Design a protein with these regions (language model features):
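Conserved catalytic cores of phosphodiester-cleaving nucleases, focusing on short active-site segments
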Residues: 82, 108-116, 132
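Short coil-to-beta-strand
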Residues: 7, 103-111
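Short glycine-/polar-rich loops that comprise or flank the Walker A/P-loop
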Residues: 107-108, 144-148
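Surface-exposed cleft-lining segments at the edges of enzyme active sites
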Residues: 115-127
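C-terminal tail/extension regions appended to the core domain(s) of diverse proteins
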Residues: 1-60, 64-70, 145, 156-253
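Active-site metal-binding core of divalent-cation-utilizing nuclease and nuclease-like domains
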Residues: 58-105
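Short, charged, amphipathic alpha-helix that recurs within catalytic cores of restriction-modification
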Residues: 125-142, 193
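Short, conserved beta-strand edge motifs with alternating hydrophobic and charged residues
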Residues: 113, 147-154
Length: 253
């Protein structure tokens, strides 16, 4: 499962240039490029881990869409960061990972909500928790069998250059973080998200937190030691992938 490592490497190489001030950042909260990249890495891991998903994708029985605006059978609408489902219309563009096409989805079989907490960890706790919680609620209210997954990237860097706090081109404003305490509190807070063990239950079908060290100026690294989730934890990335794969096989094979 390589998405966490790939995402950290992607952030290291990514450049978001402030057109007004000239500063260059790895991450900008008002851009969705990081969410798109993370969802693509997750999708690649799912295709590699699930022979069933891969087989159905190669047969065009499944397609995917990123930033998918979908209306569920009950009339509720939601923009899904990543959606995989049955096709209504298959795009003529090239396939992703030489496996799965994009297009217009008829029925969503799997969705993933992607969140990022790079700074202001304490202030972000209620908002991120509520947004994640509402995502699985909307998906399951629309289709009890659909797999609802969530993933959050939490920053453990002790300093962070926030694009929204920069006022001039002469001097960077650098925010200070009390680490690893800030990251640990966010990780523990998100462990309160429910994870269901059957389609009658309430909660995500799979959830993961990954931790990165990103000051938003230099290289970004994946943080794998505590307080990051460890193997066996219910919010570890490998378990997240295995839970999605198992649920897909049980419900949609």
């Amino acid at each position: 499962m390589v998405a966490p490592e790939e995402f950290a490497a992607w952030l290291t190489g990514h450049e978001h240039t402030d057109k007004k001030l000239g500063w260059v950042y790895r991450y900008h909260s008002r851009s969705d490029s990081h969410s798109i990249a993370l969802c693509q890495f997750v999708l690649k891991d799912l295709l590699d881990a699930s022979p069933i998903l891969r087989k159905q994708a190669l047969a065009n029985r499944l397609i995917y869409r990123i930033n998918c605006r979908h209306t569920f059978p009950n009339g509720k609408q939601k923009t899904l960061d990543l959606a995989v489902g049955t096709p209504k219309v298959v795009s003529e563009s090239a396939s992703f990972a030489e496996t799965i096409m994009t297009g217009e989805i008829d029925r969503v079989l799997m969705s993933c909500e992607a969140k990022t907490v790079m700074t202001e960890h304490g202030k972000s706790q209620p908002r991120v928790f509520d947004e994640l919680g509402s995502s699985h609620e909307i998906v399951h209210q629309g289709d009890r069998e659909a797999i609802a997954a969530g993933i959050t990237v939490v920053n453990i860097a002790s300093t962070f250059v926030s694009p929204l706090r920069q006022k001039n081109s002469d001097r960077l404003h650098v925010s200070q973080h009390k680490q690893p305490h800030a990251a640990e509190r966010m990780i523990q807070h998100l462990r309160g998200l429910p994870i269901r063990d059957s389609i009658e239950g309430t909660g995500f079908d799979a959830y993961a937190t990954i931790v990165v060290d990103c000051d938003n100026q230099g290289p970004v690294s994946l943080w794998t030691e505590a307080p990051a989730p460890q193997r066996g934890d219910r919010d570890h990335y490998d378990r997240f992938i295995s839970q999605i794969v198992a649920a897909f096989a049980a419900r949609f094979d």
